């Protein structure tokens, strides 16, 4: 078994000298205009690799993690079918709630991308739903705190139902103006529907909404 490579940075390269590395010497707007060479000096390269590149491209798994991932791929078609069925049922329920402002899920006929989803994903779309709850950030926090089955997690596609508040988690580094530009309001919630019985998931979502 071979590794995919290792980053070793001595910290001795001058990224500013030639003017050929603007990614290090110019502001990074995704992190409030930070200039890596100015803020981190000799650690500019390794910090950028950690903060930006890993964020954009994902982490690098160990050999054992890759082995486990490969095992999981063997049952992926079966799991995806259930993910999609559960998510569709939850999305349809959310769409009928008077406490929800909007629901984004390509499996819904009302979604702007439904036709494309039917064309390219005829066997099901995905297990991730985003919806905006009335009352903004305070209501979103109350809803998430009231969930009993779902877990607050940053990842998706778990066998467990997971929920996340993007504005205070994955996109917390953005300003209010940037959040608006990205279509992320304070009431937006991301729900990754799991493989629990759909009735249990629906019951949990309903009781949490009732407590908002």
Question: What label would you give each PLM region?
Answer:
Residues 1-128, 132-162, 167:
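Active-site C-terminal subdomain of aminotransferase-like
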Residues 79, 145, 161-212:
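PLP-dependent enzyme catalytic core of the Aspartate aminotransferase-like
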């Amino acid at each position: 078994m071979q590794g995919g490579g290792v980053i070793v940075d001595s910290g001795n390269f001058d990224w500013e000298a030639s003017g050929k590395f603007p990614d290090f010497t110019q502001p990074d707007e995704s992190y409030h205009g930070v200039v890596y060479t100015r803020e981190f000096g000799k650690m500019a390269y390794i910090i950028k690799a950690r903060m930006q590149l890993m964020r954009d491209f994902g982490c690098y798994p160990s050999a054992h993690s890759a082995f486990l991932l490969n095992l999981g791929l063997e049952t992926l078609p079966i799991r995806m079918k259930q993910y999609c069925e559960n998510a569709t049922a939850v999305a349809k329920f959310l769409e009928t709630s008077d406490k929800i402002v909007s629901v984004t899920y390509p499996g819904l006929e009302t979604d702007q991308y439904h036709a494309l989803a039917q064309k390219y994903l005829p066997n099901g779309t995905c297990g991730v739903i985003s919806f905006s709850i009335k009352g903004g950030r305070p209501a979103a926090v109350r809803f998430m705190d009231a969930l009993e089955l779902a877990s607050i997690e940053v990842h998706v596609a778990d066998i467990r139902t997971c929920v996340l508040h993007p504005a205070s988690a994955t996109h917390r580094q953005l300003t209010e103006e940037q959040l608006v530009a990205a279509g992320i309001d304070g009431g937006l919630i991301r729900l990754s529907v799991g493989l629990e019985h759909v009735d249990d998931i629906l019951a949990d979502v309903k009781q949490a909404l009732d407590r908002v």
